Amino acid sequence: MKEVFLDTETTGLSTKDNHRIVEIACIETEGLIPTKKIFHKQLNPEREVSEDAVKVHGFTNDYLRNKPTFDKIAPDFLKFIEGKKLIIHNAPFDLGFLNYELKLLDIEGIKKNVVVDSLETAKLKFPGQSLSLIHI
């Protein structure tokens, strides 16, 4: 089975505040071995990036201004992940943003049953330890 390790960066922490995705990064694997296929896009979020978010990912409003919007890359993104298991660290965050973006386009969201949350897996394997990606 093919898997996709997926991560996003956003303008802020909550879709309730209309924050948007500014970057999607995906690496495909097969049996957890990299296939050398990637999907990586930086996006114009069509809104301001919060100062706190810039401190996390470094993407400024000026830098993102001429990048494509989510609607332009959505078909290619969905094709890339189709039929694959998604491995996401802190999946509710990334999946929430991805499904928010898809909902804005009247596209059905990504189902939870194709997602493995590596944060939840790490909690079981490394109880009581720091679980940020840099530590595991």
Regions found by a protein language model. Name each.
Residues 1-113, 127-133:
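Conserved non-catalytic scaffold segment of RNase H-like nuclease domains
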